[in-house]
Amino acid sequence: MDLIVNGEPKQVSNEQLHLVLNELGYAGKHFVVELNGEILSKETYTTTKITAADRLEIVSFVGGG
C-alpha cells in the first residue's frame, strides 16, 4: 500500500498503524503520530487502520543539551 510518510512516498505491507510503525523502524522509539492532520493518542495505534494515500507525519524526540 502506498502512503505519504513525513512528506515522502512509502510502500508498506500492513494496514494496522502499529504494524506500519514497526515496519518503518519506529518500534521502541518515542514519537508522535499525525494521521491526515490529526494527532493520534498512543492508545489508538493498535486500532487505527491505514488506507492508501493516507498522510502520516511521525515526529521523533531527540535529547540533547
PLM-predicted stretches and their roles:
Residues 1-64:
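Ubiquitin-like/PB1-type beta-grasp interaction modules and other compact soluble beta-rich domains
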